[in-house]
Amino acid sequence: MAPERLEVLSTLKEITGFLNIQSHHDSFRNLGAFRNLEVIGGRTLTEYFASLYIVKTSLTSLGLRSLRKISSGSVAILENEELCYAGDINWTQIMRSQVHNTLLQNNRDPGKCIAGGAVCDKQCSSEGCWGPGNKMCLSCRTYNVDEECVPSCDPNLGLYEAGKEFISTLIILGQTTLLTSLIYASAFHFE
């Protein structure tokens, strides 16, 4: 199956069972089709007790930028010769089960990833990333604006920094209204 046919899954937010990826296709480079996947439930698991099982693929990065929770089951990412970034992810932030482990073996050598520039963006926190760019961070080093990690507020975008808060201006029917929104490194919330 051609990877672009997976785009039908781009609005998927939750898988109650497991995600099993075992495909080697030259143009299958990441799991971007699952970019909105937030939760893998693990109600049913693979025969290896995994809820995320990625084996012998042509992936270079995972691209699961919205994944925030694996309720049950282990993570097994094995024998993906071109895959970088998976070893940099702090899986304990995502996995809720204390009895399941993370098994990452025989993926691309981390030294080769670094030499090839396949490293997390400098705006990502130490939690890791799903792939290249400042939209693939597990969490941001400083600020998150519209799902993009940024080092500071940009006044040209109508964002102004006030301590750890952003002040944004909105123009409504010619009137300017100031809204204060608190940002604590990862949430953009208007009050």
Regions found by a protein language model. Give the residues of each.
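Short intrinsically disordered, low-complexity coil segments enriched in acidic
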Residues: 1-6, 120, 124, 149, ...
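Short, recurring structural edge motifs at helix starts
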Residues: 23-25, 63, 122-129, 135-139, ...
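Residue-level signal for mature regions of secreted extracellular proteins and peptides
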Residues: 70, 76-77, 106, 113, ...
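Functionally engaged cysteine thiol sites
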Residues: 84, 111-120, 153, 172
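Short, disulfide-bonded extracellular cysteine-rich repeat modules
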Residues: 132-154, 161-170, 179-187, 191
